[in-house]
Amino acid sequence: MKTRDFKFDLPQELIAQVPIEDRASSRLMVLDKETGNIEHKVFRDIIEYLNPGDCLVLNNTRVIPARLIGEKLETGGKIEFLLLKRTEEDTWQALVKPGKRAKVGTKFSFGNGKLIGEVVDLSDEGSRIIKFHYDGIFEEILDELGNMPLPPYITARLDEKERYQTVYSKHNGSAAAPTAGLHFTEELLNKIKEKGVDIAFVTLHVGLGTFRPVKVEDVLNHKMHSEYYMVSQEAADKINRAKENGKNVICVGTTSCRTIESACNEDGKMKETSGWTEIFIYPGYKFKVLDKLITNFHLPESTLIMLVSAICGKDNVLNAYNEAVKERYRFFSFGDAMIIK
């Protein structure tokens, strides 16, 4: 299986640069995973594809404003940190630009000394381990000084930080939003509950590896990044109940999908658990829990389009993506959505 097999042509102007005003009015492509048949809807129509007793799985991670602009304490030279993941209480793995200024022992100041970052170690793939020194509560300082770590393909400025959060975001820790969830409003979620659909919240903190291109020619040689996840007993019970009753488990986003497929046993049973996952889902994978997926339109040759192809076949996916281009759907993080049923 070659990485180039997952390539498609995408005009630059179809990459959404800003979120639309009304989250639920984005477009929705409906893709039948068996026949490849396609329908065109609006996202709030998603309720038509959810039935009483089904379980909708949402990732309630919250994006942290992980991009910090500061200066080297000794020289005043400008520096940019991008926090990737917390390794200990006040210690983070981070990408640093320019890297040559970030030798072990170097200290950097953010917000006129409100936050001091010290390089304590070098990590894999050119990142650094940073120990932070501060007075107060780290999350509050970060909220004040940090910027949202938007994906590299978004060049427009984001004026409201909350537009890059789901309305149900709860647990801080992500370097990117679980973007399929951006389409839901409180009103739509309430209507879904009223229909008798169970909602299960899981947590997976999205790392920047989600945007990292697959650089190997053979898909099987790709090494996935590691991400932290949590599944509560309540969420596990809701998912198990749906499966036991012959109902559907519908994941909102690839992160929810990767969480439940990591957290279940070989029989597809869920339990309360947490840990790190490097699960890589590509065509040939046998899903143990997932029945349907709600997701955005992904980058060519990415692990995300490979995951989607595992559900309904590469040819169906590429056909749907070409149809989306023809119909001028908006792509990537702030773009439109599809449900694979």
UniProtKB/Swiss-Prot annotation:
Any keyword rRNA processing?
no
Principal localization reads cytoplasm
Q: Name one Pfam family in it.
A: Queuosine_synth
List keywords of the entry alphabetically: Cytoplasm, Queuosine biosynthesis, S-adenosyl-L-methionine, Transferase
Q: Which GO terms describe its molecular function?
A: S-adenosylmethionine:tRNA ribosyltransferase-isomerase activity
Q: What is its EC number?
A: 2.4.99.17
Q: Is the S-adenosyl-L-methionine keyword given for this protein? A: yes
Where is this gene product found?
Answer: Cytoplasm
Q: Which GO terms describe its cellular component?
A: cytoplasm
Pathway, per record: tRNA modification; tRNA-queuosine biosynthesis
Q: Which Gene3D superfamilies match?
A: QueA-like
Group of enzyme by EC = transferase
**What biological processes does GO assign it?**
queuosine biosynthetic process; tRNA wobble guanine modification
UniProt cross-references to SUPFAM superfamilies, sorted A to Z: QueA-like
Q: Which reaction(s) does its UniProt entry say it catalyses?
A: 7-aminomethyl-7-carbaguanosine(34) in tRNA + S-adenosyl-L-methionine = epoxyqueuosine(34) in tRNA + adenine + L-methionine + 2 H(+)
- Give the residue spans that cross the bilayer: none
Domain of life of the source = Bacteria
Q: Could you tell me what this protein does?
A: Transfers and isomerizes the ribose moiety from AdoMet to the 7-aminomethyl group of 7-deazaguanine (preQ1-tRNA) to give epoxyqueuosine (oQ-tRNA).
Classification via NCBIfam families: PRK00147.1 (NF001140), queA (TIGR00113)
Task: Write out the similarity annotation.
Answer: Belongs to the QueA family.
What is this protein identified as? S-adenosylmethionine:tRNA ribosyltransferase-isomerase
Its gene?
Answer: queA
